[in-house]
Amino acid sequence: MQVLPACQSSALKTLCPSPEAFRKLGWLPTSDEVYNEFIDDLTGRTCNEKYSSQVTLLKPIQDFKTFIENDPIVYQEFISMFEGIEQSPTNYHELCNMFNDIFRKAPLYGDLGPPVYMIMARIMNTQAGFSAFTKESLNFHFKKLFDTWGLFLSSKNSRNVLVADQFDDKHYGWFSERAKTAMMINYPGRTFEKVFICDEHVPYHGFTSYDDFFNRRFRDKDTDRPVVGGVTDTTLIGAACESLSYNVSHNVQSLDTLVIKGEAYSLKHLLHNDPFTPQFEHGSIIQGFLNVTAYHRWHSPVNGTIVKIVNVPGTYFAQAPYTIGSPIPDNDRDPPPYLKSLVYFSNIAARQIMFIEADNKDIGLIFLVFIGMTEISTCEATVCEGQHVNRGDDLGMFHFGGSSFALGLRKDSKAKILEKFAKPGTVIRINELVASVRK
């Protein structure tokens, strides 16, 4: 079994999968035409005087708008970030109207990608946008927006998308053949109904809400995602999330610049200056990002004890500074700016950190960071501090939107990351091996 060698100096290998890989995973629209049609339709319905006069903004959106107008610095940033932007939203009034439309609906399966990111992409890509979107006070309001959307997505009223219908030429219900094909791409020869707990003979396959569907459970984990090597082998470290590899880094620094091209982890920022941080200096990290249609629960990578769980408030729409001003939409030779920012995002975004002390002392303490990306409401742990878990046991889940995760090893850990994950966009199946002890 090949492993990645330890590096003698700081080394970061940003895998940066191709735009086509991101597109297949639902992070990008399938074409500029799809994006333009979405924006034109949303603009036509919401960016006009009739909508503004007849439709009441959801309270958190009105609070968001009031905050912008009452804070002189934030107000000027919201004026500046829209300068030169010709396609709606062209001002914060239109942005709030678009939020008001999106946050009243559950996402459909389709060719677009995350809808909130689609309307935020251009203003994220400005210096004024970066300045505004890194402010704690503004992110407090973003969290309120997503919490409100989350309440709707957890309600029975969100189930209208859990059907086999085609809504228009680019949007489908989640039980349409097109959507099922996308969801089952990494389960060859299997069907949705056989892999996940549901009942195709009752309305909505028995799911109580969109979020219930989003966090679906395996019917038989041992068949579709077995714990590779068996639970009793404590020398093995499994994948915590179903994902694609994005980054492998060794000799990670306690403090590192967050603005360099190529990205770098800064442990003090990534781990929110936790007292455990020094143990991971010069250690290794593997990071993956999740398919929009993927399984969104987390499994334990080791047999061990949950030592600490930390919820970190952070940003939602701040892309890496070196990417600001890059072309949007980008060509197929390079991902768009936001998707070149995943390492940076892990340092500053809203996230949950989980420390686990492995039973095997050759592994010792590890960390997991579960990171929300754009329209993500919460990261929810379903375990508690002091609880013992086995490899493959449930740890928690992402809610509502796109996500990334990182797993960190101490410098003194005898576990090494498998070499296969050095390939861009390598599929990481939950419960498969990502590292193993080598003495």
From Swiss-Prot:
Its EC number is 4.1.1.105. It catalyses: L-tryptophan + H(+) = tryptamine + CO2. Pathway: Secondary metabolite biosynthesis. Transmembrane segments: none annotated. GO terms for cellular component: mitochondrion. The pharmaceutical interesting psilocybin as a treatment option against depression and anxiety is being investigated in advanced clinical trials. Keywords: Decarboxylase, Lyase. One of its GO terms (biological process) is phosphatidylethanolamine biosynthetic process. One of its GO terms (molecular function) is L-tryptophan decarboxylase activity. The keyword DNA repair does not apply. L-tryptophan decarboxylase; part of the gene cluster that mediates the biosynthesis of psilocybin, a psychotropic tryptamine-derived natural product. The first step in the pathway is the decarboxylation of L-tryptophan to tryptamine by the decarboxylase psiD. PsiD does not decarboxylate phenylalanine, tyrosine, or 5-hydroxy- L -tryptophan (5-HTP). 4-hydroxy-L-tryptophan is accepted as substrate by psiD as well. The cytochrome P450 monooxygenase psiH then converts tryptamine to 4-hydroxytryptamine. Belongs to the phosphatidylserine decarboxylase family. PANTHER family: PHOSPHATIDYLSERINE DECARBOXYLASE (PTHR10067), PHOSPHATIDYLSERINE DECARBOXYLASE FAMILY PROTEIN (AFU_ORTHOLOGUE AFUA_7G01730) (PTHR10067:SF9). This is L-tryptophan decarboxylase. It comes from Psilocybe cyanescens. The gene is psiD.
